[in-house]
Amino acid sequence: TSHYAGIKVINMEIFRDGEVIGYSNYFFKHGDNTVEIKNYTQFKVKLFGVVIFSISSEAHEKYKNDELIYFKSNTFQNDKEKYVNLYYDQTKNKFIIDGSSFKGEANTDSIIGNWWNHKILKAEQQISPLSGSVKGQVVTFIGKENIELYGKSYLTDHFKLKSKNQDLPNDKKLDFDIWLDKKNNLILKVAYTRMGEWEY
């Protein structure tokens, strides 16, 4: 998180099949050896004018000396409530998770699966920011790539992030293309396919 010392806001538009359908915005508050990040995510997928999939989510995470100590989120997915309450237990040196799809412990090298944090590309496990589930992941470096965003060209490192367990059902599998700006360690773009072509 020290890489993000000067950053106050990261705004991400969410595209599906080339059309903007929502946003995921991160707001940073820096203190003495602490960082707090608030995230607001909203999008709706419509088919013939009818909403077939929607997310409305708020999350709050806290870091002390670059280490995650707290995460809380509330999400409505198609009006179904999901949640995560996570805290760091110093005596066990573990994350304690109370989530809508997982209750238990996770190793402290697990990363919350949020796109502001480039450390997701180094982690072996990610914790779902919506439900608290813990998934093993494998990250592969594809190569250097020039990409264009909003009329600007960026030299990026292109990575593929996939689930370690390939036996998971397709809707539970991790399968993302991620483009990282190595200069400032910011993830510039994320793409995946699920009910259409998605980009953040």
Model regions and ranges:
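Acidic, serine/threonine-rich low-complexity disordered tracts
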Residues: 2-89, 119-200
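Hydrophobic, well-structured mid-protein blocks that either form specific transmembrane helices
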Residues: 71-113
